[in-house]
Amino acid sequence: MPIFFYLFTTLIIISSLCVVLSKNSVYSVLWLIFTFINAAGLMILLGAEFLAMLLIVIYVGAVAVLFLFVIMMLDINFNQAITKLRENLSLSIFITLIMFVDLVITVILSTKNINHSSNISFAIANNISNTKAIGSVLYTDFMLPFQMAGLILFVAMISCITLTLKKRERVKYQDIRKQLSHNKGNVILMTKPILNKGVENIKYE
């Protein structure tokens, strides 16, 4: 078991670095999928098969594949992206250092609050699956954060739909109800044009 733990952990670290360092976005997404698969292996080692299946189905099967399709369909100029990155290299390094220092400080402050002298053991009932245990905790102790997360995702979904349904002034739209209500009385126009004037003064709907 420790061998598999170190194996999955090493593969996660290597694949995560490849996600960031890969110049091709398609390769980055493939490395991201590989990272999620190894994380699912860690979940299986911890006995959380439900979380492992969620990682595979949701992140690999939906999110990562969606990223892959979007990147493959977009016409991305990698040389131009690299040029822009080099122009803002100093700013990128500065922001990276700030985030790294923030992460180190957070880890140091978090480890100080851990009481290493206490030896607490948690009894896990054999008749309760990890799915039932996660559900009972999620809908009792963490019910409010869970509902807020769902509300945030719902607002994000509505915002995406609103942005895609934004009407443009120069785009012509079909009025289906008006088209279906046409008959020969309001479609066929009988007129007698004036000599040498053609149909200039005829008004169409």
UniProtKB/Swiss-Prot annotation:
It is found in: Cell membrane. It catalyses: a quinone + NADH + 5 H(+)(in) = a quinol + NAD(+) + 4 H(+)(out). The keyword Membrane applies. NDH-1 shuttles electrons from NADH, via FMN and iron-sulfur (Fe-S) centers, to quinones in the respiratory chain. Couples the redox reaction to proton translocation (for every two electrons transferred, four hydrogen ions are translocated across the cytoplasmic membrane), and thus conserves the redox energy in a proton gradient. Keywords: Cell membrane, Membrane, NAD, Quinone, Translocase, Transmembrane, Transmembrane helix. It comes from the Bacteria. The chain crosses the membrane at residues 1-21, 26-46, 54-74, 89-109, 142-162. The gene is nuoJ. One of its GO terms (molecular function) is NADH dehydrogenase (ubiquinone) activity. This is NADH-quinone oxidoreductase subunit J. The keyword Translocase applies. Pfam families: Oxidored_q3 (PF00499). It is a multi-pass membrane protein. Its main location: membrane. One of its GO terms (cellular component) is plasma membrane. InterPro entries: NADH_UbQ/plastoQ_OxRdtase_su6, Nuo/plastoQ_OxRdtase_6_NuoJ. Its EC number is 7.1.1.-. Belongs to the complex I subunit 6 family.
